[in-house]
C-alpha cells in the first residue's frame, strides 16, 4: 500500500515546480571552495546531512522539491517501492578524500557524526572505520569545546551540516565553539551553506543572556530565519565570538535559494525530526520538552502530537516506546492522551508565528497547574525569557504574550539584515 501511495505521490509531484531553478547547495560549488583547500590540512564539521547536493535515489521524493500537503508527512527514507533501497550520497567526506583533499579530522555535534545518538546523549570520540579519519566529538563528557590538541590537527575548518533555524537547535552552538577556537588559533573557516527549512519567518523573544546555555548561546530570536552561513557572518560581524574576536570566515552561498522557499530535505536533520511537517511544527511543540507533557518522542511522529497519561478527556491516544533516537522516552509504555497535529494544514503551520496555543491547550487539560512545567529552568533555557512561563500559568491570551516579544522580533529582523545572503 505504501508503495502505491508513494508512486501516486511521486507522479503528482512531477506536475509541481521545484524550488525555483534547482537550489544548488554550497557543497556542490567545487570551483569556489576546492582552491581554498589546496595544501591545507582540512577538518570538517558535519554529520549524516552532509550529502553533496542532497543526492538520493529510491526515495518517494527528491531534495529541493517544494513541500506540499501531500509530501509534508512522507517519512524521510521511505522507499518509493517495497524492497527498493534508499541510497544517499556521496557524503562530503568521501568526495573530499576522492579528490585528494587532506582531511585530517572530523568534528561531530549532538547526535554524533552518524546521527544515531539520542537528544542530549553524550557521544565519545572515535576513528571513522571507513576512512580512518579521527572523529572528535564536541558533545562528549570530556568537553563541548575543541581542545588545543584538536586545533593542532588542521589548518582550515570546512562546515557542511543541515540546520533548522531555531535558537535551541544545537548545531549552531557547536559551530560557534569551533569559530571561537578558530579565531583564537588563527584557523580559516569555510561554510558550505544550506537552505534553512524555517527560513521564511522570524519570531520569538531575543535570548536574555542570563539563560545562555548549550541550547541557546546567542542574542537571537527563537526562530531566527537565517542559514548557518548567514548566522556565522552575524556572529563575526556583531562581535559575538569569544573575546569579541573575528575569524577568517568564508561562506559559499547556495544558488537559486530565497527565504521564501519551502524546500524538501532528504534526511532527518536529527533523529526525532522524521518528516518535513515535524520540522515546521518543532518551533512550537518543542516547548513541551520543558513541561511534563510529552511531544511524542518514542512514536513515529515526534513533535507532531502531544499528550500526557492524565489527559484522559482527550479522544486521541498514543504509547511511547523505546526506539532508535528515543531509547528512554518519557512515559515509556504508558498510554498518553492528547492531540494529533498530523492533519493540521500547512497554511496554518506556515503562518510565520510560533504557536503557543498548544501549550495553553495542554495546560487547560492537565489536572494541576503545578504539575505542568518542570521544576527546573529548561523551559526558560528554550524560550529565553522568564515571562512566558508566568503568563501561560496566569492564562493570559497568547496574543498578549506574542505582543510582549514583538519589539524583539522587529529589532532582530532589522539587525540581521546586513548579513543576509538571500532575498527575504
What positions do the PLM features span?
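Bacterial Sec-dependent signal peptides at the C-terminal "C-region" and cleavage site
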Residues: 3-4, 8-24
Amino acid at each position: 500500500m505504501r508503495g502505491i501511495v508513494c508512486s501516486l505521490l511521486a507522479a503528482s509531484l512531477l506536475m509541481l515546480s521545484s524550488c525555483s531553478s534547482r537550489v544548488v547547495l554550497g557543497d556542490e560549488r567545487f570551483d569556489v571552495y576546492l582552491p581554498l583547500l589546496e595544501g591545507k590540512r582540512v577538518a570538517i564539521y558535519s554529520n549524516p546531512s552532509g550529502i553533496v547536493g542532497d543526492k538520493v535515489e529510491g526515495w518517494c521524493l527528491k531534495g529541493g522539491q517544494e513541500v506540499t500537503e501531500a509530501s509534508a508527512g512522507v517519512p524521510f527514507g521511505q522507499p518509493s517501492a517495497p524492497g527498493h533501497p534508499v541510497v544517499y550520497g556521496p557524503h562530503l567526506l568521501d568526495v573530499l578524500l576522492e579528490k585528494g583533499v587532506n582531511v585530517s579530522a572530523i568534528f561531530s555535534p549532538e547526535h554524533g557524526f552518524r546521527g544515531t545518538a539520542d537528544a542530549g546523549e553524550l557521544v565519545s570520540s572515535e576513528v571513522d572505520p571507513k576512512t580512518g579519519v579521527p572523529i572528535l566529538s564536541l558533545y562528549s563528557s570530556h568537553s563541548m569545546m575543541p581542545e588545543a590538541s584538536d586545533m593542532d590537527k588542521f589548518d582550515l575548518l570546512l562546515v557542511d551540516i543541515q540546520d533548522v533555524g531555531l535558537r535551541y537547535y544545537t548545531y549552531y552552538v557547536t559551530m560557534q565553539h569551533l569559530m571561537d577556537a578558530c579565531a583564537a588559533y588563527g584557523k580559516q573557516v569555510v561554510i558550505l551553506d544550506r537552505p534553512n527549512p524555517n527560513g521564511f519567518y522570524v519570531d520569538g523573544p531575543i535570548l536574555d543572556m542570563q539563560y545562555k546555555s548549550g541550547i541557546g548561546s546567542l542574542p537571537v530570536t527563537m526562530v531566527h530565519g537565517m542559514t548557518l552561513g548567514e548566522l556565522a557572518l552575524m556572529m563575526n560581524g556583531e562581535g559575538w565570538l569569544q573575546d569579541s574576536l573575528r575569524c577568517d570566515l568564508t561562506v559559499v552561498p547556495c544558488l537559486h535559494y530565497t527565504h521564501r522557499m519551502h524546500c524538501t530535505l532528504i534526511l532527518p536533520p536529527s533523529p526525532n525530526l522524521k518528516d518535513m511537517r515535524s520540522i515546521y511544527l518543532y518551533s512550537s511543540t518543542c516547548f513541551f520538552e520543558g513541561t511534563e507533557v510529552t511531544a511524542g518522542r518514542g512514536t513515529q511522529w515526534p513533535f507532531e502530537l502531544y499528550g500526557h497519561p492524565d489527559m484522559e478527556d482527550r479522544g486521541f491516544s498514543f504509547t511511547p516506546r523505546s526506539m532508535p533516537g528515543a531509547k528512554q522516552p518519557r512515559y515509556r509504555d504508558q498510554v498518553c492522551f492528547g492531540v494529533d497535529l498530523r492533519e493540521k494544514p500547512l497554511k496554518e503551520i506556515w503562518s510565520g508565528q510560533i504557536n503557543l496555543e498548544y501549550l495553553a491547550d495542554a495546560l487547560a487539560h492537565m489536572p494541576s497547574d503545578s504539575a505542568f512545567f518542570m521544576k527546573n529552568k529548561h523551559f526558560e533555557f528554550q524560550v529565553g525569557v522568564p515571562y512566558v512561563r508566568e503568563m501561560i500559568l496566569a492564562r493570559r491570551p497568547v496574543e498578549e504574550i506574542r505582543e510582549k516579544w514583538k519589539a524583539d522580533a522587529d529589532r532582530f529582523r532589522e539587525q540581521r539584515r546586513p548579513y543576509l545572503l538571500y532575498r527575504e
